[in-house]
Amino acid sequence: QKSVNNTFYRKMETPKANAIISWFNHKMPYSVDNAIKADVTGQILSMIYLKKIREEASAAYTVGAQGVFSKSDDGFQIGQIVAYCPIKPEKKDIGLKIIDDEIAKLSTTCESEMLDKIQKLLLKQFDDRTKTNGYWSSLVMNNYVMGLDNHTAYKDVVSKLTPMDISKFVKDYLSSSNKVSIIMLPKE
């Protein structure tokens, strides 16, 4: 696992810090299963980071995360889990520590209540999306160009996810990912 940290300073009228932490993985293969697990991982991390960074540490007004897996028509595939946080400069160290600590914790344990909430949301969003032309147009194009079927097994995969599935995914994902940290701090 490689890690790159780009911390830089910028003169600002209103001092603030921004952190973007991204874990890239091009070794784990693209699949509907991995794409769903990456999405769920990002949503769980968003919930955790909001609670720990915003509510408990008061280190940021907002914070979020997202996970995606994508494949292009030339066969290139990549996963990305990203945490982003406009953070209070004086609390950047604690915020960044929470980001790292909590993704590591997720690789060993996942709260079932969070997973249940996200599963219900994903299934509802899926049903809503299937009522739009854009959804079906994108599905046909992805199937034609790349041979992907992100529709048929979606509900089944989402419904059957367990906390252990998410933790194993995160553990496997992190073991072969590269981490990039981009941190902007105010210049005195």
List PLM regions with ranges.
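Generic recognition of flexible, low-complexity loop/linker segments
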Residues: 7-9, 51-52, 67-69, 154-156, ...
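Short, intrinsically disordered, mixed-charge
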Residues: 42-46, 50, 54-58, 101, ...
